[in-house]
UniProtKB/Swiss-Prot annotation:
The gene is rpsL. GO terms for biological process: translation. Signal peptide: none annotated. GO terms for cellular component: small ribosomal subunit. Residues 125-141 have a biased composition (Basic residues). The modification 3-methylthioaspartic acid is found at residue 89. It holds the Pfam family Ribosom_S12_S23. The lineage of its organism: Bacteria, Pseudomonadati, Verrucomicrobiota, Methylacidiphilae, Methylacidiphilales. This is Small ribosomal subunit protein uS12.
Amino acid sequence: MPTINQLVRRGREKLKRKTKAPALDSCPQRRGVCVQVMTRTPKKPNSALRKVAKVRLTNGKEVIAYIPGEGHNLQEHSIVLVRGGRVKDLPGVRYHIIRGTLDASGAVGPSNTNKLNRNVSRSKYGVKRPKAGAKPASKAK
């Protein structure tokens, strides 16, 4: 426990907050090149083949980033935009690839529907707004 005089002279040291996405260097997004596109299996209670890519960022750091949505067109040497945000059941995956920018195309619709266009959560998957003349999706009865 410091004395009052020591506190007057030095003061207390502020606790530094650790960043959750250190490879971005305090930037909201970073551009990068896909080095390898692969699938990973999630942690214990879950089972799937999650699509991920190893990306070399413009600052020279290599990270593993998740490819959200269903279906993708990424391959080696694709240019992508990476944001922070971890995937809870994939250890070591702390970044997401932004769909609909650079070489990453927008996602197609969910597989539990028979339509190929995504109408909900479009902004998260880089899907453009449907044309005004297009017929609306049929409602299940």
